[in-house]
A protein has these predicted regions:
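Short boundary/loop segments of OB/S1/cold-shock single-stranded nucleic-acid-binding domains
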Residues: 7-26
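OB-fold and OB-like beta-barrel modules that bind single-stranded nucleic acids
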Residues: 28-34, 75-86
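Conserved positions in beta-strands of structured domains
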Residues: 35-38, 50, 61, 85
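Short, Lys/Arg- and Gly-enriched loop/turn segments at beta-strand edges
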Residues: 44-45, 86-95
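OB-fold (S1/OB) nucleic-acid-binding surfaces
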Residues: 45-58
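A beta-strand/beta-hairpin structural motif
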Residues: 58-64
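Short nucleic-acid-contacting surface segments enriched for D/E, G, S/T with interspersed K/R
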Residues: 65-79
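Single conserved hydrophobic/aromatic residue that forms the stacking wall/gate
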Residues: 99-110
Length: 110
């Protein structure tokens, strides 16, 4: 019996490709509470969005920060427009934030 055996890298690359091709996971709006927010010296912002049922890791690259008119902080309720993708090296998925529009109310859009 012949078995297909794949490397970790092959599996992660395949999963990344599946995420990229899934139209539901591209340009998706996700709402949640900002958690674990860290501004990196590179200009990127690393954070998580959470709600009562789960959490997703997020990244906003420095080049995407132009439209962000407020400083993200722990506990803010936000809506993020982005693409769900994978970080192949670690085999983890994350939300890659694309655009940011803020509102003056407690609910902000990023």
């Amino acid at each position: 019996m012949m078995r297909n055996v794949y490397s970790v890298g092959q599996v992660n690359a395949y999963i990344k490709n599946m995420f990229t091709q899934d139209f539901m996971l591209n340009r998706i709006y996700v709402k949640g509470e900002v958690s674990n927010c860290k501004y990196h010296t590179s200009g990127h912002i690393y954070f998580s969005l959470k709600d009562e049922s789960g959490m997703i890791a997020c990244i906003m690259f420095a080049g995407q920060r132009g439209g962000l008119s407020f400083r993200m902080q722990e506990g803010q309720q936000v809506i993020v427009l982005g693409n769900v993708t994978t970080y192949e090296r670690d085999g983890k998925y994350q939300l890659l934030s694309l655009i940011h529009i803020s509102e003056p109310t407690r609910r902000s859009y990023i």
